[in-house]
UniProtKB/Swiss-Prot annotation:
This is Large ribosomal subunit protein bL28. Pfam families: Ribosomal_L28 (PF00830). It comes from the Bacteria. InterPro entries: Bacterial_rp_bL28, Ribosomal_bL28, Ribosomal_bL28/bL31-like_sf, Ribosomal_bL28_bact-type, Ribosomal_bL28_sf. One of its GO terms (molecular function) is structural constituent of ribosome. The gene is rpmB. Belongs to the bacterial ribosomal protein bL28 family. SUPFAM superfamilies: L28p-like. One of its GO terms (biological process) is translation. Keywords: Ribonucleoprotein, Ribosomal protein. It comes from Syntrophobacter fumaroxidans (strain DSM 10017 / MPOB). GO terms for cellular component: ribonucleoprotein complex; ribosome.
Length: 64
């Protein structure tokens, strides 16, 4: 599975590490993805990768 939220589409961002000598090297910032069980509209339960913001705002419907 990819490093992408299935609800909002949040993906890794590219930027630079900057040292005290102002040397720059590329790096990635990853979203805080969690594997959670999600119940879709048909009632089927499946595992999805969702960012913590989508979990907090209620986009992920957890089964009872």
């Amino acid at each position: 599975m990819s490093r992408k939220c299935e609800f909002c589409g949040k993906e890794p961002h590219v930027g630079n590490n900057v040292s005290h000598a102002n040397n720059k090297t590329k790096r990635l910032w990853y979203p805080n993805l969690q594997t959670v069980r999600h119940m879709d509209k048909s009632g089927a339960v499946r595992r999805v990768k969702a960012c913590t913001r989508c979990i907090r705002t209620g986009l992920v419907v957890k089964p009872a």
